[in-house]
């Protein structure tokens, strides 16, 4: 698959342990926290283990200015004090999206990212207990996760 159009042309699987397309870009941190608190028990109940999302890399253009022979992948993997040097990747890492799956040229129009994007993967906390969550009603999963949501 090469385009978003290609992706929507294939049939969706009946069940999947993965979900794509949650956005945490917001001006309100409280809004992001509310989305995660609401979504988490639903993800556990549905058996989702991983969440994938796409992100721009807004520091890329400035970083490449002084490094004519550098590769985009080098920027995406670059760390300072163990954290990604790109501010967006650093933010997503703090929210649990620690795996960089792919670097995608022409991902979407974003000037500071030179239209590059990265595909990131995060693991749904406590998803290894999938058989337990599947056996419980959603209300019980919500009751269990509510006091733990501050850890997200």
What is each model feature region?
Residues 1-26, 31, 42, 57-85, ...:
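Conserved acyl-donor/pantetheine-binding loop and adjacent beta-alpha core of acyl/acetyltransferases
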Residues 36-45:
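A conserved short alpha-helix in the GNAT/GCN5 acetyltransferase fold that borders
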Residues 49, 98:
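Short acidic/polar active-site loop segments enriched in Thr and Asp
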Residues 50-56:
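Active-site cradle of extracellular carbohydrate-active enzymes
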Residues 146-147, 151:
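Activity-critical C-terminal alpha-helical subdomain
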């Amino acid at each position: 698959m090469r385009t978003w159009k290609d992706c929507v042309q294939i049939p969706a699987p009946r069940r999947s342990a993965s979900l794509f397309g949650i956005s945490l870009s917001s001006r309100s941190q409280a809004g992001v926290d509310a989305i995660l608190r609401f979504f988490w028990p639903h993800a556990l109940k549905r058996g989702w283990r991983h969440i994938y999302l796409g992100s721009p890399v807004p520091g890329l253009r400035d970083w490449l200015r002084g490094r004519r022979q550098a590769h985009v992948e080098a920027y995406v993997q670059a760390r300072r004090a163990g954290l990604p040097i790109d501010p967006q990747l650093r933010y997503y890492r703090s929210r649990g999206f620690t795996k960089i799956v792919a670097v995608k040229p022409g991902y979407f129009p974003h000037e500071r990212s030179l239209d590059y994007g990265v595909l990131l993967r995060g693991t749904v906390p406590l998803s290894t207990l999938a058989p337990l969550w599947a056996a419980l009603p959603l209300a019980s999963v919500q009751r269990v996760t509510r006091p733990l949501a501050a850890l997200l």
